[in-house]
């Protein structure tokens, strides 16, 4: 239901701008005294065939009655330009008394004018809050009273002012709360407070009310009165008579009585229909939701033209669930269509805005647009902008009520001390200006306003548009355009106008013709009018109302085929007409309007003759295939990919044929292969439509039968995600042909693969240590690093050379720290650079040696620098003590193990492990270890555990390396000084070379200064042809 309401609201928004024949732009506005509630009730009044007025109730207006405050008025207003409103005097007396200082009645605040109805020259107006003091008790009772005016006199009609007093009788009747006239010259009065507020309907004949009136009689009994009687206590507080209407529901030609009972059935609400002959019950309609006030308003009219009266019931407090699932008060109108076979077909119409009180008032409008079906108005007096009020106009049709309003009237008055309540009262179905169309009055008592909307005469237009011929042969050039033969055709357009009601005899229309309408603005239109060489033509036409068709004919021509591409799409000839409203206005200033249910435009099509057989319909047979030599793409690499595409047409011509390549998000289009003579050089463009990336290539217009094209398209694939396993390209040929305009979709899929060149390398800094160390003395309990021995760093770098990234690598380091209970390399600390976490199987720096601050370049020593340093010293460069070199590694020494987990590493990135240690010099200074050379070796290995690409497999990737620090007993070689004679000889050679250079430059005039000429004749003359053979080529 919420979805239906939303769709109807959208429809309303669209149709509201399509103003139908109520003149909402120039309404007649009437204003009353501020605070008088002018507009609380409205009606039309026709005292004779030549007169028409508006009736407006103002129940809180002050009158000239003696000692009466806010007695209320009914005002009579002119509908034409003189919008003067004058009160009708129904009662000029003050309160009557039983005796002096013993009042009979209380007319102050009686709300006279709260209900008003008229029929011909008679007006019934009521004061439902009128009080009187009964003859037997001193209590005031709101029995209500009415006055019936017949043009010559006004008589009081107070059927509830009877001897049946108190709440259990008619003492709280509030007679006249709702009223109506029947066609049979009866009045119907609702009194919702009778019988403990069960409510009551009372009907009397107009003639008897007039005849039996006696100002001295307070309680009048009528012989032909029809009235409902009290029911059981279960019906208390039901409010029968809250709203009333009349209509024939028995088929006997006599109008029956309809009444809303909004609090009946435990507040579900009811509407009851009583027989117009004897007040017997005929039908009961029960609401479906508690407290919706079902029956707040009722109305009757034949909405579907089947000659059976239909019933409309308002429930302004009805709640429906919104899009969020919560209940919202939107209001509802029930449409009860009376069937010929008996019973009713019921439909529901929900409101569109919350708290708008949709259905508060319902008014039959008569046949507003003269289409043969009656229409209705439904008010939402607190809807719209700032709750100014809305009135929806619904049109009848053979199937019932059109659920989409044809017009929405909006209140234009801002709130004062209370909401404007525009639409609280409605009255239609009366032609106030005698133009053949019924009009509508809308009351807005919150701003003391009534508004008259007159219906505009509806013009029905019959239009015709013809094109001859409809098949345009570009080769048949029968017309001349500036001595050039062109292919031409004729455009004929006709208009005829008629309508009901008062319309001028001549109607002026502006007709607009447009050739090739479907081409967007700025595009080349393929056809032009011969006389103007333009695609559009305007014409003013005068049409006689009810006359014959008025026609005109124009020549148009087809442009040369070289001027446009689209030869397949039909050429649309479009005609639109508009009424000149200024020349059609009547004497009262009312404009007619075109029938909005008939489009004011039409179109025809012409086709260009194609080489497509006798039927002029081209049916191509399009095929596309694709291949590539590249079968695998490595993630992380900038992979060039060339697709070789074959496009064929084995059928008839394909117009505006294009190759569409859907580009996956992992790829970018580079261009077309142009360095291969075997491949066609297509014209291609990259486009994005609705977030779909595509390459569109032109294949010809037309792509003739038998065409076969071979082309190469270059892409770069480099934006793979972690979940991708392949890259897919979709290809299709599309044309503008009507039939068989698409080829089957071809696709090329290339698989993704992982490749990562991971390497590990290490370096020792320094790589040689020479013993003994000068001035070094061992300490039994070392406290600082220098107390232990010289610094030894091993640096390991794990580098990913790509192209693919990895997400997890395990690296294991083996470190020789003890041999035969002698400490070798004592690790002081280790540090990392990059996404790496490490743990060791033994405590680092267990002696808690104080760690010295690193030098500035100690940690940042690079591998390139380490490789280029002259650490490698051969044995012949050393004066070493002869002896074997003993290797101490994890094969013969105790090793500490460090395990590192390396995280995500992109191509070209590294993770580095810095191991800072001290050579335990005391070990090598022992006598048994002296005069020997040692090679201390640490090792590192890695294994790639995981890649971030979840759906791809990979091969085992691992490697290892060894870092060596050499310990040598001997004398460290010193660099030899350069001899003095070599230095002297080099200086002399440099001076000799400088002298030679100076001599050569002197000989060439380098040191000679060139001065500018002093005399005019010394200046060099400019030669005109010095720099070429003539200035004409410049």
UniProtKB/Swiss-Prot annotation:
InterPro entries: FG-GAP, Int_alpha_beta-p, Integrin_alpha, Integrin_alpha_C_CS, Integrin_alpha_Ig-like_1, Integrin_alpha_Ig-like_2, Integrin_alpha_Ig-like_3, Integrin_alpha_N. Belongs to the integrin alpha chain family. It is found in: Membrane; Cell junction, Focal adhesion. This is Integrin alpha-V. Glycans are attached at residues 62, 278, 284, 540, 601, 690, 821, 837, 860, 931, 951, 959, 966. SUPFAM superfamilies: Integrin alpha N-terminal domain, Integrin domains. Disulfide bonds join 77-85, 126-146, 160-173, 479-488, 494-551, 612-618, 684-697, 838-900, 890-895. The keyword Calcium applies. SMART domains: Int_alpha (SM00191). The chain crosses the membrane at residues 979-1002. The gene is ITGAV. Residues 1003-1034 are cytoplasmic. Ca(2+) 1 binds at residues 248, 252, 254, 256. It comes from Gallus gallus. Residues 1-19 form the signal peptide. A motif (GFFKR motif) lies at residues 1005-1009. The lineage of its organism: Eukaryota, Metazoa, Chordata, Craniata, Vertebrata. It is a single-pass type I membrane protein.
